[in-house]
């Protein structure tokens, strides 16, 4: 591939790429690791870790409660065009909790349909932090990046030389 398609600059082993939505894969790995360590269950209601979730109004009175597995599989019922957008790692978790506290709309009943959800994965990131007692970034770095030898994986790109940072394309 290309570091810069317009200038036809090829990618190299030194090229740096933004993680963007790939953080969802790392988040899922972290949740499964915490599950394997017995620190949480995929069947746990999300409200166990985010009490504000218990105040949400579902589409029907008999709708199932959102659990961690719903967030992992994007079947929580959140709309794709969600208010959180791409998870902003520099935003405090309090902003996410405030969003939940204000109420999240639903497009489906939990477990009854798939819709891509940044909000769901932001909530999982919060759960990783709460259960591990570490910041999300620190947990992922220490428990996933380092053991996998991902020594050139960065959260912030300010220190990366511009000629090594790939331009993202859709």
Identify the residue ranges that each predicted region occupies:
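Short, conserved catalytic-motif segment at the N-terminal edge
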Residues: 1-19, 39, 93, 101-105
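Short, surface-exposed loop or secondary-structure junction motifs
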Residues: 2, 58-170
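Short linear capping/connector segments at secondary-structure termini
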Residues: 2-4, 14-15, 45-54, 85-88
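Catalytic tyrosine of NAD(P)H-dependent dehydrogenase/reductases that use a Tyr as the general acid/base
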Residues: 17-20, 114-116
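Active-site SXXK
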Residues: 18-43, 121-129
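Generic hydrophobic/packing signal
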Residues: 30-35, 50, 72-79
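Short, glycine/proline-biased beta-turn/loop segments that scaffold the active-site neighborhood
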Residues: 42-59, 146-148
């Amino acid at each position: 591939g290309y570091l810069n398609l317009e200038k036809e600059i090829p990618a190299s082993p030194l090229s740096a790429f933004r993680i963007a939505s790939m953080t969802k894969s790392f988040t899922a790995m972290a949740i499964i690791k915490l599950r394997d360590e017995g620190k949480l269950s995929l069947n746990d209601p999300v409200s166990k870790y985010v009490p504000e979730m218990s105040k949400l109004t579902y589409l029907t009175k008999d709708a199932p409660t959102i659990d961690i597995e719903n967030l992992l599989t994007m079947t929580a019922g959140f709309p794709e065009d969600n208010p959180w957008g791409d998870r902003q790692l520099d935003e405090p978790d309090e902003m996410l909790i405030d969003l939940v506290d204000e109420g999240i709309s639903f497009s489906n009943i939990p477990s009854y349909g798939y819709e891509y959800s940044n909000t769901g994965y932001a909530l999982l990131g919060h759960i990783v932090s709460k259960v591990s007692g570490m910041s999300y970034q620190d947990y992922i770095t220490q428990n996933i990046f380092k053991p996998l030898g991902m020594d050139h994986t960065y959260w912030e790109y300010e220190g990366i030389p511009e000629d090594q940072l790939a331009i993202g394309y859709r």
